[in-house]
């Protein structure tokens, strides 16, 4: 969930900590200046390790980086607090979509912050990182009573949450999690997100010369094209379906013996999304057989749909925090996946 002031979630009810805007913006400027493309988050992680260590919080880094081919892992810490209150988890990711090297934050007179136009700004998710950092700093600096809280900053979120999938969830104590990874005005929170399923179909035919012996060939691209023509794309009932890439062939005068098709299915009903994936595979198999080809169909569930009950504890705590901060809460639905999909599974 995207929160206006994480200190409202962390603190005892009625306790409001002072947010230092200049410090907050300075931290954002510094974080943005650090290169952090997916799998290359080392600089951001090192800065977070130093900043939290200065607050007396020891972030622990796991070995995820080495496993996924990156240079940084997931960072985690538990901070004790008032045991009469339930602990909460605050989370943000450390990577950004490319181009994420050579970033520079430009502060405009009207209050806007943009990149210089040559890269992304990286507010996704460095704005979330800064919100959490400033909130934690303010709570500890003011000596405010607070609930126990956990921090989890994951690597490689932009590549379908690769980092968080390797985290040891048995370490977590909190049953309430807030993920700072939603765009829009402060006060918005996503309570529902879809399953995201990808598929890959490799059609195999038989190569032959397209002029001298075309009848000896088995046309893999034609088989793939026949399949794609039968797959409805866009909004399909409650789902979205997309064929994203198709590639094959070696030369204009060769009957292609190989063609690869990739795509995805998204939906808020996980079983329905799986059913659609099965239907797509069946279409692929029939089209391949009709052209004398074979097809190898594989799929992967990148994340599973969730829905948070607006009447539940997580949402109610969020509503209370918004009220104390003078914000109008807005519950929204998102069509994107995030770390929260994985937290909801645990």
Question: What are these language model-derived features?
Answer:
Residues 15-39, 301:
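N-terminal capping segment at the start of a domain
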Residues 37-84:
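A non-catalytic alpha/beta surface segment that caps or lines the substrate-entry region
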Residues 60, 220-346:
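Metal-dependent amide/peptide-bond hydrolase catalytic core
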Residues 78-123:
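Catalytic-core environment of secreted peptidases
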Residues 114-123, 207-213, 249:
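A short glycine/serine-rich beta->alpha loop
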Residues 119-194, 234, 240-245, 252-253, ...:
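Acidic/histidine-rich catalytic neighborhood of metal-dependent amide-processing enzymes
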Residues 132, 177-213, 217-227:
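Phosphate/diphosphate-binding glycine-rich loops and adjacent basic-rich segments that engage nucleotide
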């Amino acid at each position: 969930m995207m929160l206006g002031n994480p200190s409202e979630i962390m603190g005892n009810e009625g306790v409001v900590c002072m947010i230092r805007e200049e410090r907050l913006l300075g931290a954002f400027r510094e974080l943005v200046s650090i290169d952090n493309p997916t799998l290359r988050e080392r600089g951001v992680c090192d800065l977070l390790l130093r900043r939290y260590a200065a607050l007396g919080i020891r972030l622990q880094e796991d070995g995820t980086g080495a496993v996924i081919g990156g240079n940084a892992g997931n960072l985690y810490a538990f901070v004790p607090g008032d045991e009469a209150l339930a602990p909460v988890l605050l989370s943000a990711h450390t990577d950004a979509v490319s181009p994420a090297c050579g970033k520079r934050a430009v502060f405009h007179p009207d209050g806007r912050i943009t990149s210089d136009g040559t890269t992304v700004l990286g507010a996704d998710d460095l704005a979330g990182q800064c919100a959490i950092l400033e909130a934690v700093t303010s709570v500890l600096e003011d000596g405010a009573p607070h609930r126990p809280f956990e921090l989890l900053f994951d690597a490689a979120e932009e590549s379908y949450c690769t980092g968080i999938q390797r985290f040891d969830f048995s370490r977590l104590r909190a049953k309430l999690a807030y993920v700072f990874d939603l765009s829009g005005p402060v006060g918005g929170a996503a309570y529902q997100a879809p399953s995201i399923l990808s598929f890959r179909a490799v059609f195999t035919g038989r190569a032959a010369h397209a002029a001298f012996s075309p009848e000896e060939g088995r046309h893999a691209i034609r088989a793939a094209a026949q399949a794609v023509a039968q797959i409805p794309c866009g909004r399909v009932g409650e789902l979205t379906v997309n064929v994203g890439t198709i590639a094959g062939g070696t030369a204009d005068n060769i009957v292609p013996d190989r063609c690869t098709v990739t795509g995805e299915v998204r939906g808020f009903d996980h079983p329905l999304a799986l059913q659609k994936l099965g239907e797509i595979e069946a279409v692929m198999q029939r089209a391949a057989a009709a052209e004398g080809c074979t097809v190898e169909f594989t799929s992967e569930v990148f994340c599973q749909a969730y829905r948070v009950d607006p009447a539940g504890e997580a949402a109610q705590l969020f509503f209370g925090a918004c009220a104390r901060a003078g914000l109008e809460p807005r519950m929204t639905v998102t069509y994107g996946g995030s770390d929260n999909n994985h937290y909801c599974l645990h």
